[in-house]
Amino acid sequence: MSNELDFRSVRLLKNDPVNLQKFSYTSEDEAWKTYLENPLTAATKAMMRVNGDDDSVAALSFLYDYYMGPKEKRILSSSTGGRNDQGKRYYHGMEYETDLTPLESPTHLMKFLTENVSGTPEYPDLLKKNNLMSLEGALPTPGKAAPLPAGPSKLEAGSVDSYLLPTTDMYDNGSLNSLFESIHGVPPTQRWQPDSTFKDDPQESMLFPDILKTSPEPPCPEDYPSLKSDFEYTLGSPKAIHIKSGESPMAYLNKGQFYPVTLRTPAGGKGLALSSNKVKSVVMVVFDNEKVPVEQLRFWKHWHSRQPTAKQRVIDVADCKENFNTVEHIEEVAYNALSFVWNVNEEAKVFIGVNCLSTDFSSQKGVKGVPLNLQIDTYDCGLGTERLVHRAVCQIKIFCDKGAERKMRDDERKQFRRKVKCPDSSNSGVKGCLLSGFRGNETTYLRPETDLETPPVLFIPNVHFSSLQRSGGAAPSAGPSSSNRLPLKRTCSPFTEEFEPLPSKQAKEGDLQRVLLYVRRETEEVFDALMLKTPDLKGLRNAISEKYGFPEENIYKVYKKCKRGETSLLHPRLSRHPPPDCLECSHPVTQVRNMGFGDGFWRQRDLDSNPSPTTVNSLHFTVNSE
C-alpha cells in the first residue's frame, strides 16, 4: 500500500438509525467508539510506524480525533477521491450542529462544496491555524506537506444531482464500509496490543510444536510395542517421563489404589506353540534381580514387621465382577504374588493394588524410595507340565495419597523447562520419545524379558507358611499329584527353607523369650534389674538365686498381689500376659505378710527392637525365702 491516503465520502443524515450488516449499534458514535476500543497513544503510533504501517496510523488518527473529541467540536470532512485515483483532493472543514440543518437543502450543499473544494495539491496552513485536523501523520516526511499529483476529481465529472442528499432514515452502507476497507489492521487471528513493548511474539504459542503433532511418531526403542512378542501386558497407569536408557518402563502408583492389568495376545491366540488355549499367569511385585534373594527377603521381612496386622499383603486383587468374567481360579500364592487362569483367545483383565510404599524398606527418614518391579510370568499348563513361556516387567513407584499424580505433574513441568532451554538440541529425538509417555497415553506396556530361568523371590512369612501349605498355595503335598504342580509353587518352599533369617536374627528371636524384672529387698529403696532366661517360676527362682546367693530350693513360695489388694500363690508358669486384675504399672507393692525377701514387679521388654527398658506388663509378686 502506498503512503498516500484516500478518504471516502461519509454522508451523515439527520436522526439516522443504524443499519449495518456486521455492527449493530444504536448510534454512529457507539459504532466507532466500539471499534476504537483502545486509546491511540504516542507509543502505539511510534510502534506502528516502525512496522511500516503509516497508513493505518493516519486512518486511526483521523477516526480517533473525530469521534473521541467533544460532539459539538467535531469536524465534518469529506473526500471525493477514490482509492485508485492518483489525484487527491483535501477539503476544509466547517462546524456543524447535531441536526445538520444547513445540509438538508441542495442550495446549502452546493455552496458548501464549492467553498471547501480546492484544487491545490498541498496542505493549506489554514487547517493548522483553525485547529482543524492535520494529516501530517500520513506524510512520508513529518512536518512538511508533500505535494500530490493533480488528477481529475469526481466532483468535476459528476453531475449536481448526484450530490443531493435524499431525505431518508437509513445509512449509506457502502460509504461507511469503504472506510473500513481502507484501514489495514492486523489479521483477525492476532490481537493488537497498543501498549505492548514487543514487536511480535509468534513463537510463544509454539514452544512445543511436536506435542501438537497429530501424525504418529515412531515409538522409543525401549517401548514394548516395537518388540515382537506372543503376549502383551499393560498396566492402567501413565508411563513415567524420565526413564534412563535401557531400563524398563516405569509407572507411578498410589498405595492401596486398584489399577487394571490387561493381558492379551496380539494375534488373538493364533500361532502360539501352546498345548491348550488356557494359560496361567502370576502377577507379582518383586525387587530387581540385581539384588540377591537374601537381601530381597530381608526387605520384605522389614516391611512386614512394620505392618499393623500380620495378614497385610503386598499385592491384592479387587473383588469385582470384571475380574471373574475374564479370569478364573484366582489364587494368592504368596504375600507378593497372585495367580489366575485365562483364555488366550480373549482379553483378560484384573484389578490389582499394591499396599507398600517405595520408602517402607528403610527405617531412615528422607531416603530415596526403592523401585519395585511388577512382573508377570505366564505358564503353559495344558499337558500337566507347567512351562514358563513368557515374562514381562515394568518398574513401579508407589506413593501415598495422590502422590502419583503430583509426581507426574512435576515431571511434566521439568520436561517443559528442559524443552524451553534447549529446543534445538541434538537429543530432540530422545526427548520426543520421552514426551510421548504422556501424550494421551494412560497405559504402560510391560517390557518382555529374555531371562526365563531366574526364579522369582516370593515372600511367605514363617508364621503363615503352614496355613499356606494347608491351602495348597505354597508347597506340594505328598502324593502322585505333586509332580503336576506349577514350578512356582514348588519353589516357594525351598526359598523359605534356604533363606532363613541370619544368625543374628535367630539370636534376637531367642532373646524375645527373656523377661526383665525389677526387684528390691525390704530395706532397699532402689530396684535392681533381674533377668529371667525363661518366663516361668523356675527361671525366676534361678535368677534370684544367682543374683542374691539364695539356694534355689529355699525359695518355695512366691505370691502375687492383685490390683484389688488380694494376695495369691503364683502359678508355676508365669504368664507373659497376666489377667487385667494383676496389672499394676505404677508403684511397687506394699509389704505383704510373711514376706521375708522383698517385693518387686514384673517388667517385660523386647530386647530386639528397643534396648531401653519399656514396661509392657507389670505384675507384683512377693518371694518368701523361709
Swiss-Prot record:
How does the annotation summarize its subunit structure? Homodimer, also forms heterodimers with GRHL1 and GRHL2. Interacts with LMO4.
Which residue intervals make up region (Transcription activation)? 30-95
Task: Tell me a GO biological process for this protein.
Answer: pattern specification process
Which UniProt keywords are listed?
DNA-binding, Nucleus, Transcription, Transcription regulation
Looking at the record, which disorder is this protein connected with? Van der Woude syndrome 2: An autosomal dominant developmental disorder characterized by lower lip pits, cleft lip and/or cleft palate.
Q: Where does it live in the cell?
A: Nucleus
GO MF annotation, one? sequence-specific DNA binding
Q: What is this protein called?
A: Grainyhead-like protein 3 homolog
* Matching Pfam families: CP2, GRHL1_C
Q: Which GO terms describe its cellular component?
A: actin cytoskeleton; chromatin; cilium; cytosol; nucleoplasm; nucleus
Q: Which gene encodes it?
A: GRHL3
Organism in which the protein naturally occurs: Homo sapiens
Function field: Transcription factor playing important roles in primary neurulation and in the differentiation of stratified epithelia of both ectodermal and endodermal origin. Binds directly to the consensus DNA sequence 5'-AACCGGTT-3' acting as an activator and repressor on distinct target genes. xhibits functional redundancy with GRHL2 in epidermal morphogenetic events and epidermal wound repair. Exhibits functional redundancy with GRHL2 in epidermal morphogenetic events and epidermal wound repair but is essential to form the epidermal barrier with TGM3 as critical direct target gene among others.
- Mind giving the lineage of the organism this protein is from? Eukaryota, Metazoa, Chordata, Craniata, Vertebrata
**What InterPro entries is this protein classified in?**
CP2, TF_CP2-like
Additional free-text comment from the UniProt record: GRHL genes (GRHL1, GRHL2 and GRHL3) show a paradoxical lack of redundancy despite their extensive sequence identity in the DNA-binding and protein dimerization domains and the fact that the core consensus DNA binding sites are identical. They have related, but remarkably different functions during embryogenesis because of their differential spatiotemporal expression patterns during development.
Q: Where is the Grh/CP2 DB domain?
A: 226-460
